[in-house]
Amino acid sequence: MIEVKVKDAALREAAMQDMDAFLGVFINATKEAIGGELNAENMQQLSVAQITLLAYDILHEEVMDGGFVQLIYNGYGGFIFDNSFAKVLRDWGLRDLAKMLFAVRKLYKEYGEKIQRECSDDEFMAMFEQFPEFDDYDDEFVENEEDWTEAVARYVDEYIEEFVVIEE
């Protein structure tokens, strides 16, 4: 297992800012510990909690930027929907998000191959109109993003030792 370390001062400073800054300390430290990007090799060196946090970061960034169609197009569908990510989030207390991800998983199974195909920028932009089934889920994520991110931050704060080692 990789030991992810954060400075106590950095944590305290981020906690005084907001939940995004607080989570950012954990996410950035984890990414730094694995060399910048999550892959099959370094994933084996992380805990389930650390992987789940990085998965939430990917989900958050992709869906807030371009919705579930973008997340799937960028190749994250398998990572988000074919693993136990939603189940772990449910265990963390994010039942509504987990329920939504199980629903989106059905759409991913139905449309994933079509969305992931190589295409031009114009063809990619047209996908948002071709797959309107994702729209309500995109909206639901955006509407609940603050609450869900806060719930993730609360879990991380409550179980810090699952994520990092705090240094003075």
Protein language model regions, located:
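Extended, alpha-helix-rich binding/interface surfaces that flank or overlap catalytic cores
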Residues: M1-V69, Y73-F81, V88-E168
